[in-house]
Every structure is written in C-alpha cells, then in structure tokens.
A protein has these predicted regions:
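Alpha-helix C-terminal capping segments
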Residues: 8-13, 27-32, 126-131, 183-189
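Residues at the C-termini of beta-strands that transition into short coil/loop
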Residues: 39-42, 140, 197
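Conserved acidic, metal-coordinating active-site core of Asp-based
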Residues: 82-172, 180-183
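Active-site phosphate-binding/coordination module
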Residues: 1-88
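Short, glycine/serine-rich, charged loops/turns that create anion-binding
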Residues: 23, 43, 102-105, 178
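A structural signal for isolated positions on well-ordered beta-strands in alpha/beta enzyme cores
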Residues: 15-17, 37, 97, 172, ...
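Mg2+-dependent phosphoryl-transfer enzymes with acidic/Ser/Thr/Gly-rich catalytic loops
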Residues: 149, 153-218
C-alpha cells in the first residue's frame, strides 16, 4: 500500500473495508496492518479490525476436486511453460486461484502478462467452466478466481452491511474488476460502485472523494 494511501485511509472517520481475493493475513500485510474490516477470499473469510472472526466458509473437497480438474485442463492450453516455483495454483480455503504466470511472479512480470485480460478470456473460451455450484472470475492482474456461485463479493458485502446495521446508500465500493466476468462485478447493484484502473487511480479517486465530502459535495 502506498504511504499516502495508508495515511488517507487511516485518517478517515468512516469504516473502511478491504474486499479481496487474497487471504486475510496477506491483506493485513499488504495494507501495512491498516485498521480495517477484512473480507478475504472474495469475502468468504471476514474479520473485524481487531482480528475477531465474523465468518469463514471454505470450499468442500468435492468442489476443490472439480476446480482442480478444470485448472489442469486450462494448463494444457497455456501458451508458455508454467513456472511451478511461482505457485500457479493457490488453495486459499474458500477460493482457489489459478495464475498461468504464477501467483507469486515478480510484479514487473505480472504487469505486462495480461493487462487487457484477453489471455485469460481466451483460456476460458477454449475450456469453459461448467458447474452447478461454482463460478470462475477474472481477478487481479493475472489470475482466475474460483468461488461458490452464491458466495461472492456482492453477497458478502451485503451480508456485512446487514450484520453491521449499515445503510447501503451510505456505502461506496472501489474496484478494478467491475466488468463482465470480473471479480468485482457482483457488487454492482448492491451498493454504489466506482471502477478504478489500479492502486494509483484508486488513490486519486479516494482523495477526490474525501475532498468533496469535506466540502459538502458528497
């Protein structure tokens, strides 16, 4: 997280929620232990800012087997050698993530691997994922996220809002996956959403949002 982003979020009086495909401990690390509610694995593992667990709903073994079989089929169509040292498959509990280049590939490699998402879309066109209970979404810069079709970011954001007794009209969501088949798409229609390109764009929009709020515009 950018130091200026950390300071901006830290000083906000509103509740901050990080919704991510990553595991909760990694969210904490990536955000420099910023005090936030954390919805990891597309919201299927939720914790309070102090670490108190709100819920955790992992995939079952049958679903894991179904996902891994599809990933193995996808691997046959990847147009390069897969570097297994870069962890192409991560089982995060409630979510399994496949990155053809590797989940822990260097950032500079990830940035140029599939910026327009076409490589991943072509893979899914070649090997469609057909499941009664599961879906796959394009997530992050290089990954495909497999989750339960009824337990995605949209349902989990709504679940948290209901649990906390908040008003949906008071909530706003910033995401880079607010497009068809994106891993933020399910939040559209749940609360107000704003599409961002990357972390720098997120910072600029948040800074503008906070400035306008102070002026009474928002």
């Amino acid at each position: 997280i950018l130091p200026e982003m950390f300071e901006l979020l830290r000083d906000l009086p509103q509740d901050i929620i990080i919704v991510s495909g990553q595991e909760v401990p990694k969210i904490a690390w990536q955000t420099s232990e910023l005090s936030t509610i954390r919805l990891g694995q597309n919201g299927n593992h939720a914790t309070e800012a102090d670490g108190t667990e709100l819920w955790n709903i992992p995939l079952d073994d049958a679903h894991r087997s179904e996902i891994l079989a599809h990933i193995r089929s996808l691997m046959e169509h990847v147009d390069h050698d897969i570097n297994h040292e870069w962890n192409p498959i991560e089982d995060r509990g409630a979510q399994i993530t496949f990155s053809p280049i590797g989940n822990i590939a260097p950032v500079e490699h990830k940035k140029i691997y599939d910026p327009d998402r076409k490589k991943r879309m072509i893979l899914l066109e070649k090997v469609p994922f057909v499941s009664e209970d599961l879906v796959v979404k394009i997530g992050g810069s290089t990954s495909l996220d497999y989750i339960h079709k009824d337990r995605h970011k949209g349902t989990n954001v709504a679940k948290l809002i209901k649990l906390k007794g908040w008003k949906k009209d008071d909530a706003v969501y910033f995401g880079d996956g607010l497009f068809p088949s994106g891993n933020d798409e399910s939040v559209i229609g749940v609360i107000d959403t704003h599409l961002v390109a990357d972390h720098l764009h997120t910072y600029e929009l948040l800074r503008k949002f906070c400035t306008e709020e102070k002026r009474g515009i928002v």
